[in-house]
Amino acid sequence: SPMAEFIFKDMIKKKGLEGDFVVTSSATSTEEIWNGVGNPVYPPAKEILNLHNIDCNGKRAVQIKKSDYDKYDLLIPMDSNNVRNMSRILKGDPNNKIHKLMSYTGSDRDVSDPWYTGDFEKCYNDIYNGCKALLESLI
């Protein structure tokens, strides 16, 4: 989720930890990528980030690829469908790098999906709480 990418980047920046993390987001499907060009952040998601003074300008969708598995220590999907897609694209998870974001809050539930609810603030709150717990687990 680009929302998670930029919320987490904002958190680490505020703690002066930007140099300690590489944070990016990738799609698990091609729905937001046309002719090899990714769409920008969905306008309502961009709007909710802007309301929280978080800038996501310039971000475009890219799809996760198998080579990403070796590049990152953790891969953090937003929901169970993302977990399945990531496992398929990455050909499994032998090093146990895939963890749903909400698992860091002690919950097994998915991040509220604004595609179905239209509630981008609830989605933001889920992601914020998940990112906060994730960061606390790492520092």
Where does each model-flagged region fall?
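Phosphate-binding/catalytic loops
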Residues: 68, 74, 80-139
